[in-house]
């Protein structure tokens, strides 16, 4: 009898601990421009490139009892084609024509400089997370150069630990805000059009 009771307690304790551990999440966010842009170009060609300047695809951890097992990541292979499509769409909205090999055309390089997800380290339950995204935009037009950094952040509170779909949406939202902020900078359109 005592043996069964002890076994039952061990089983319940094991399930409780498992409930506090979070598995890793590989996110596939969909960044999108979320505000209209003002056209300043007349269809001139622009070479558009994107790069991943992050030191690692890992954004951070989901926290919880064992944060080292709960990494959140976004791979460069997943995010770069989406950023390329959005950067080209932004250049079109600004009135220019994205062109892969245009000779002597202005160049715009969008670099994902930082993407972070931080949740409190203490405590068994994830109740909030801070997400930040930073892009660097480099524009070169003949001898003129411009470089700017554009960021966005988001603090989200949760009633329970967020699932993969929730984190994917939140990271996509913060990427979208930073991306839109970058292309709303009038200096970029002016530099491309000179």
Regions from the PLM with identified roles:
Residues 21-29, 94-147, 153-161:
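Surface-exposed short loop/turn segments
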Residues 66-78, 142-193:
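Short secondary-structure boundary motifs at beta->alpha junctions and helix caps
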Residues 73-100:
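Mid-chain, structured segments of secreted extracytoplasmic proteins
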Residues 20-82, 187-194:
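A structural "domain/chain start" motif
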Residues 1-20:
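Sec-dependent bacterial lipoprotein signal peptides
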Residues 9, 42, 129-131:
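A short, structural micro-pattern
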